[in-house]
Amino acid sequence: MVKLTSIAAGVAAIAATASATTTLAQSDERVNLVELGVYVSDIRAHLAQYYMFQAAHPTETYPVEVAEAVFNYGDFTTMLTGISPDQVTRMITGVPWYSSRLKPAISSALSKDGIYTIAN
């Protein structure tokens, strides 16, 4: 016969190893900051590609906070607060490599932070 304390200890051990998760709306600022962090990192890694895209699409503008974050190699997350969710979505999904590069990286970063999103 298994003791109740053994079962409780096993459940506690499993719970301790499971990562905490949070479900947030896609427009939540924490989700936007993760998305923008991935976006800024991608711009840094592929700067020439972004310059070519912007030259071909001059009406596609970026908030000054994004440009500052790209060229400031310190902690940039506080610079990115206050950018509207609609603007975040427009910038990130507006590039041709969104599906192939940004979307998987954003999904991975959100998952790593224990964040799952739901539609607004």
From Swiss-Prot:
Residues 1-20 form the signal peptide. PROSITE patterns: SRP1_TIP1 (PS00724). InterPro entries: SRP1_TIP1 (IPR000992), Yeast_SRP1/TIP1_CWP (IPR050788). One of its GO terms (molecular function) is structural constituent of cell wall. Transmembrane segments: none annotated. GO terms for cellular component: fungal-type cell wall; fungal-type vacuole. GO terms for biological process: fungal-type cell wall organization. Pfam families: SRP1_TIP1 (PF00660). Keywords: Signal. Belongs to the SRP1/TIP1 family. Seripauperin subfamily. This is Seripauperin-1. It comes from Saccharomyces cerevisiae (strain ATCC 204508 / S288c).
